Regions:
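Membrane-embedded alpha-helical signal segments
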Residues: 1-219
Length: 219
């Protein structure tokens, strides 16, 4: 189940972000405490949590007390009060309108947030080159006239990483590369190039941040 959820997550991220994140490896580590999992990005720990393979995690959406027997804990992704309960208490938990999450989903949810927090690091030089190669099949002139005469592949990678760091999707790579070509004629500064790209993606960025009511929430 966990493996299938991770595959689905990678497909979802590819649709949303515009590139395929690296494969996720699952490994046993006997040095970890019991029931502990660790999520790493490039071999460096990014997050950890506790899991009960034979239990269910419940949370009360109202924030109130959860009147079911079990072990109190903290939901690992968002730090919410939670409780591990036996699987045979699922129906009772649902009847009480608690949120019920199985162990694979707990890990996948945590992994999703780790990916979002580290998107820029996950876009490698090789993946950037692949994106440009794929774009070159339909936009050959744009790619050949821009790279490497105006900007290098690593320069494009840095611009894309800047966008991902701001949770801006890079799906519309042709518009992004057009904007890079425009800006790089007058400046080699990657951050200034990114600013120009961001302005060209204004409609996309606004749409992505628009709520169901048609308004963009401001804090």
């Amino acid at each position: 189940r966990l493996t299938e959820q991770i595959k689905a997550l990678r497909r979802q991220m590819a649709r949303e972000l515009g590139f395929v994140i690296p494969a996720v490896r699952i490994q046993d580590n006997m040095q970890l405490p019991p029931n502990t999992y660790v999520l790493k990005v490039k071999e460096i720990e990014a997050a950890r949590g506790d899991i009960r393979p034979d239990a269910l995690l419940i949370m009360n959406p109202s924030g109130g007390k959860m009147d079911l027997p079990g072990d109190d804990t903290t939901e690992p992704t968002f730090g919410l009060p939670a409780k591990w309960i036996a699987e045979n208490q699922r129906e009772e938990a649902l009847f009480r309108n608690y949120t019920v999450v199985d162990p694979p989903t707990v890990i996948t949810t945590h992994l999703t947030e780790v990916i979002k927090d580290n998107m820029s690091e996950l876009l490698s030089y090789a993946e950037t080159q692949k994106l440009l190669d794929d774009l070159g099949k339909t936009q050959q002139k744009l790619v050949s006239e821009t790279i490497p005469s105006q900007i290098s592949v690593s320069g494009v990678q840095r611009v894309l990483q800047n966008l991902l760091r701001e949770t801006v999707s890079i799906r519309d790579l042709s518009t992004i590369l057009e904007a890079i070509a425009e800006a790089s004629r007058s400046t080699p500064n990657v951050h200034m190039v990114t600013e120009h790209v961001r302005s060209r993606l204004a409609r996309q960025i606004s749409h992505a941040n628009t709520g169901p009511d048609g308004y963009i929430p401001l804090v």
